């Protein structure tokens, strides 16, 4: 097994769940873990799941992070693998990985990651098959963006929304630290606004239930979210600024929740026009943490709102590093149990609720897995949220 990509509140629990299931139904199966994802596979860095590890596997459900380490490695990006010292010049990373799996006697590979991780696993399985080595690959869908096609709910996303709302609750208390305060809460989500919307909904729900004194800065109106911006919902800055200026004038603060993917096309276009290099990761994705969408939004709104102070905060690392909540733990258990059972049947795929098959939990074919699933901004819970905060 291996975990790969960024963290999510499911990795530790998923590793624990896989170990527990194998111990329960196939205790004689040898289980190893590659450290630091595909980097460990390329370097032959693996550890045995011992009897002691099996006995303590249940403890992994209480923690965030991953017990076996992660990395962002694309096996088909030869140049990057060579640059990072994972393979030598002239070597094919797919061949190196295949040889390592063969040497280790691996006939089932469990990958826990996003669409890139699982598509890479599919590439590896296809390469092995073409070279006469059969490998069953069973993936688990990890991404807090909840943007994997055709999977209804990715592991860890519910927890990330809950934790992002907790983060926002404390950050938004800063509205009382300065007159005319603009707070921008930047939420992870490259191409999909689901996490931003779900985080805003969770925070708004808390505001509705909280018992405020309704005195000056301690009021629902000053603690609530005032606007939610996601990539899938275009908006006019001038129109929004006019609406938000009225909120600033009345309540002395404005709290925005924005997806890190909102406004990226405009930012990238401006950088390219200025002749600046756009930073990208090994998968070709724009490195959002280096172009700072939150700062861009703050700059667009600050003057128009007459803000005296601007605070931009990112909840991503806080929310993605949490231990899984009860809802995610239940989903993780269903998926890890199914993943092991599928592996023992020799059935490859990514385990999840298949939206195109009536939300059936199954091993979804790799050629149907893709990233970039769009958030449905017509979802009733989201349109109701926008209506309640005056943004509809």
Question: Predicted regions span which residues?
Answer:
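Short, ordered loop/turn segments at secondary-structure junctions
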Residues: 4-6, 34-39, 72-73, 114-115, ...
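Glycine-rich nucleotide/cofactor/substrate-binding loop typically near the N-terminus or early
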Residues: 22, 27-104
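Short glycine/serine/threonine-rich phosphate/pyrophosphate-binding segments
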Residues: 8-18, 41-42, 76, 92-95, ...
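Accessory alpha-helical/coil subdomains and C-terminal extensions
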Residues: 99-100, 104, 111-113, 119-123, ...
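C-terminal non-catalytic interaction/assembly regions of soluble proteins
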Residues: 263-392
């Amino acid at each position: 097994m291996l975990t790969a990509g960024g963290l999510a509140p499911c990795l530790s629990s998923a590793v624990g769940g896989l170990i527990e299931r194998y111990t329960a139904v196939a205790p004689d199966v040898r289980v190893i873990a590659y450290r630091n994802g595909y980097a460990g596979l390329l370097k032959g860095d693996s550890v045995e799941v011992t009897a002691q590890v099996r006995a303590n596997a249940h403890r992994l459900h209480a923690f965030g992070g991953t017990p076996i380490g992660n990395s962002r490695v694309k096996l088909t990006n030869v140049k990057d693998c060579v640059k990072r010292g994972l393979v030598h010049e002239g070597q094919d990373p797919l061949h190196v990985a295949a040889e390592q799996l063969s040497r280790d006697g691996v006939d089932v590979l469990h990958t826990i990651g996003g669409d890139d991780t699982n598509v890479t696993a599919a590439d590896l399985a296809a390469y092995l098959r073409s070279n006469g080595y059969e490998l069953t690959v069973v993936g688990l869908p990890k991404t807090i963006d909840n943007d994997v096609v055709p999977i209804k709910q990715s592991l860890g996303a519910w927890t990330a929304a809950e934790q992002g709302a907790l983060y926002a609750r404390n950050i938004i208390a800063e509205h009382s630290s300065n007159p005319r305060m603009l707070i921008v809460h930047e939420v992870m989500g490259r191409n999909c606004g689901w996490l931003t919307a779900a985080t805003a909904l969770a925070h708004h729900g808390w505001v509705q239930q909280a018992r405020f004194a309704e005195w000056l800065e301690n009021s629902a109106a000053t603690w609530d979210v005032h606007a939610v911006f996601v990539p899938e919902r275009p908006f006019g800055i001038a129109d929004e600024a006019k609406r938000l200026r009225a909120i600033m004038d009345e309540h002395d603060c404005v709290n925005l929740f924005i997806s890190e993917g909102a406004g990226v096309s405009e930012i990238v276009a401006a950088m390219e026009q200025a002749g600046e290099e756009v930073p990208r990761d090994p998968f070709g994705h724009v490195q959002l943490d280096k172009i700072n969408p939150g700062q861009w939004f703050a700059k667009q709104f600050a003057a128009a709102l007459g803000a005296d102070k601007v605070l931009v905060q990112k909840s991503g690392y806080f929310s993605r590093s949490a231990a899984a909540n009860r809802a995610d733990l239940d989903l993780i258990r269903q998926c890890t149990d199914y993943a092991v059972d599928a592996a023992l049947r020799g059935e490859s795929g990514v385990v999840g609720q298949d939206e195109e098959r009536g939300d059936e939990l199954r091993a979804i074919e790799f050629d149907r897995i893709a990233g970039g699933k769009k958030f449905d901004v017509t979802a009733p819970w989201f349109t109701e949220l926008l209506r309640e905060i005056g943004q509809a």
